[in-house]
Design a protein with these regions (language model features):
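Short active-site oxyanion
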Residues: 1-2, 63-68, 133-135
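Active-site-proximal loop/helix segments of hydrolase catalytic cores
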Residues: 114-179
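Active-site environment of divalent metal-dependent phosphoester hydrolases
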Residues: 28-29, 51-56, 76-79, 94-97, ...
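Binuclear metal-ion centers of metallo-dependent hydrolases, dominated by the metallo-beta-lactamase
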Residues: 68, 80-94, 175, 179-221
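Active-site HxH/HxHxD metal-binding segment of metal-dependent hydrolases
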Residues: 33-112
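Zn-dependent metallo-beta-lactamase
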Residues: 1-19, 26-30, 97, 104, ...
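Active-site neighborhood of phospho(di)ester-bond hydrolases with catalytic His/Asp-centered motifs
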Residues: 21-23, 42-50, 70-73, 136-141, ...
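Pre-active-site segment of Zn-dependent metallo-hydrolases
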Residues: 12-51, 56-63, 111-117, 141-153
Length: 221
């Protein structure tokens, strides 16, 4: 698997000759201004919930690439209404086998509404299993005991966890989440994009490295 980080909560994973893109928010992210969204590849776009900083570039990328949008029912219906019929709806606890592997939609503790105020259903995360490895994307969430179920059922290669605090887990809770899912290869997400989620990267890195192994993704260009 090849992991590419685009900033905020957006990253992609190449697995089984497919590119899985998560929560695309690039054009509105000042920290990602060097990235040309027209070059971002996707065969599938996974949306954890409806907030603008997770869906902003999804429609643009889906129209250009023909990618399938995977999310909860309410979010996929919203994209259908935006003229994007190529979607796959999941709901909590449900899974589906795609051409690259199996995806399960799991619980997240957060809120969700679409940019126009439409109800976004319940937020979630994704557990993806493939022949090349397994990983968990938490989406925006608080620390939750449900994460222990992931560790009991799936041997993870890495976990992508929010660490920015204020709106989601902070560093300490993310480290506890890593313990819950029994994975210590961690990709930290959802930090430094806005003032409320600013953290001190050097001290945060030291804290994470002292208790887990931080995953170093390929830098997006």
């Amino acid at each position: 698997m090849k992991v590419t980080y685009y900033g905020h909560a957006c990253f992609s994973v190449q697995v089984a000759d497919k590119t899985l893109l998560f929560d695309p928010f690039i054009t509105g992210n000042e920290l990602a201004k060097a990235i040309d969204v027209k070059t971002v590849a996707a065969d599938y776009i996974f949306i954890s919930h409806g907030h603008a900083d997770h869906v902003a570039d999804a429609a643009t990328i889906a129209k250009r690439t023909g990618a399938t949008i995977v999310s909860n029912y309410e979010v996929t219906v919203w994209f259908n209404q935006q003229g994007l019929p190529k979607t796959h709806a999941l709901n909590h606890g449900g899974g589906w086998r795609f051409d690259f592997g199996h995806v399960k939609f799991v619980n997240a503790v957060h809120s969700s509404s679409l940019p126009d105020g439409t109800y976004g259903g319940n937020p979630g995360g994704f557990v993806i299993e493939s022949a090349e490895g397994n990983f968990y994307y938490s989406g925006d969430t608080a620390l939750t005991m449900d994460m222990k179920l992931i560790g009991e059922s799936t041997r993870l290669t890495f976990a992508a966890l929010c660490i920015g605090d204020n709106f989601t887990m902070g560093i300490d809770d993310a480290i506890k989440a890593a313990e819950f899912v029994r994975c210590h290869e961690i990709l930290g997400l959802h930090y430094n994009t806005f003032p409320p989620i600013r953290i001190d990267p050097p001290s945060s890195d030291r804290e994470i490295q002292s208790r887990t192994s931080a995953l170093t993704p390929v830098a997006a260009r």
